[in-house]
C-alpha cells in the first residue's frame, strides 16, 4: 500500500514537472524604479530615477528560463533638481520629445535554481546596445495585502553615455561617461 502511494505521488510530481508552465508577472509601477548614477565632471556623482515604468517578467522555474520586457518613460527622469531634470529631458541628453521611451529586453540566466543575471539589449536615444544586468537579490512571496504571489528583484549593470549618441556625451567621453543603471522591480502574478 505504501509502495503504491509513493508511486502515485512520484507520478504526480513527474506530471507536474512535465507540465510546468511559464508564469507572467506584471510590473507594479508604484514599486518599480530604474535609477542612474554617473560622474559630474569627476567631482561628484549625479543620481536620478525614473518614475514611470511598465513591463513584464516571464519565468519558467522548471525549465530555468525567463524573459524581461521593460519600458521606461524618458521624461519621467527625476534628479531632485528641476534644472537637471529639464537638461536630461532635452535634446542634449535623452531627447525625450523625439525618443520618449527607454526599452530593455533580455533573457534571464539561472545558476542552479536562482535567477542570477539578465542578458539583453537596451535602447536609449534611438540606439540599441547589449546590456547585462546582474541580479543582486530576488524573492517571491504570497503578498499579505494583494493575496497573490508578488516577486521582487534588484539588479544592476553598467553602460556608457558616449555609446548612445547624446550631445552631452562629449563631457562623458571614455571612463567619464560610465553610468551605473540599477532597477528595483516588483511584479504581481498575472491571473490566467
For every predicted segment, state its role.
Residues 1-6:
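Bacterial N-terminal signal peptides that target proteins for export
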Residues 15-18:
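N-terminal signal peptide c-region/cleavage motif recognized by signal peptidases
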Amino acid at each position: 500500500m505504501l509502495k503504491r502511494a509513493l508511486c502515485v505521488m512520484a507520478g504526480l510530481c513527474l506530471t507536474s514537472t512535465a507540465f510546468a508552465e511559464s508564469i507572467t508577472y506584471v510590473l507594479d509601477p508604484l514599486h518599480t524604479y530604474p535609477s542612474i548614477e554617473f560622474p559630474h565632471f569627476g567631482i561628484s556623482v549625479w543620481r536620478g530615477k525614473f518614475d514611470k515604468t511598465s513591463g513584464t517578467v516571464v519565468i519558467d522555474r522548471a525549465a530555468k528560463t525567463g524573459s524581461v520586457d521593460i519600458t521606461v518613460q524618458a521624461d519621467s527622469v527625476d534628479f531632485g533638481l528641476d534644472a537637471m531634470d529639464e537638461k536630461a529631458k532635452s535634446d542634449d541628453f535623452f531627447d525625450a520629445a523625439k525618443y520618449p521611451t527607454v526599452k530593455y529586453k533580455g533573457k534571464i540566466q539561472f545558476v542552479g535554481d536562482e535567477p542570477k543575471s539578465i542578458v539583453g539589449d537596451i535602447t536609449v536615444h534611438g540606439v540599441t546596445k547589449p546590456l547585462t544586468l546582474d541580479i543582486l537579490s530576488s524573492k517571491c512571496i504570497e503578498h499579505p495585502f494583494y493575496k497573490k504571489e508578488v516577486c521582487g528583484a534588484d539588479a544592476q549593470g553598467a553602460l556608457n553615455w558616449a555609446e548612445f549618441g547624446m550631445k552631452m556625451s562629449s563631457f562623458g567621453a571614455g571612463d567619464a561617461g560610465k553610468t551605473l543603471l540599477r532597477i528595483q522591480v516588483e511584479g504581481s502574478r498575472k491571473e490566467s
